[in-house]
Amino acid sequence: MLEVKQIKNEPIDSNCFVIYDKAIRDDCIVVDPGSENNTGLYDFLKWEGLNPQYIILTHEHFDHCWGVNDLRKKYLRVKLICTSICSQSIQSRKHNHSVYHQQPGFELEPADLEIDNINWTLDWYHYIINFNSAQGHTAAGVIFTIGDYLFTGDELIKDIRTVTKLRTGSKEKLVESVKLLEEAKGNGLTVCPGHGEVFELDEYDLNLMIGR
């Protein structure tokens, strides 16, 4: 059975998620490891006996990718997945915004797999991960589904109007994301957002994303 563990990043309280199915293997996927110190994540991985195979970034901002460098050092086989725009942006401390939070900031190496180049899908032990571009919060953004879970990064956060004023954000693209998410309703998807609590997509008023 597919399981998802939510772990709060620190010091910024963004969400990291671990996707796993121990009935298949001990491999797992880490989504948005944004902690300066990965202690909480590492404790969970050790407790469950899990080994990260992939890291997926929903977008480039530092509070969603801060832990990537250390993960790559600790787990040498792990592969980073994100959009091509995200891959470019994480290489710049200005574009990933880390320099504005804490001098001197940090930079990441490029992604190992760019979502644009794998036809927006990934077969992971017979679970199909479907990616979609979601460029309201940032042009680098992506949302994706696996099983009954929908990972939205900062494109969709419960009861929060989506922030579009940062670099490459777009109100017009956000409207497209609202339409995309409306079409996903009716499938019993659980939303795993970039901040805050997990919630059910079918029960949520998506107009809150754009302040209606």
Model-flagged regions — what are they?
Residues 1-48, 142-153:
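Conserved beta-strand hairpin/beta-sheet module of binuclear metal-dependent hydrolase folds
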Residues 2, 50, 78-79, 127-129, ...:
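A structural micro-motif
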Residues 7, 19, 118-125:
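Short acidic-hydrophobic surface loop/beta-edge motif
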Residues 7-8, 112, 132-135:
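Short Gly/Pro-enriched turn/cap motifs at secondary-structure boundaries
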Residues 28-32, 54-57, 131-133:
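Short catalytic-loop micro-motif centered on adjacent basic/acidic residues
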Residues 29, 56, 80, 151-152, ...:
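Residue-level marker for buried hydrophobic side chains located in beta-strands
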Residues 35-121, 209:
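Active-site HxH/HxHxD metal-binding segment of metal-dependent hydrolases
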Residues 36, 96, 127-212:
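Metallo-beta-lactamase
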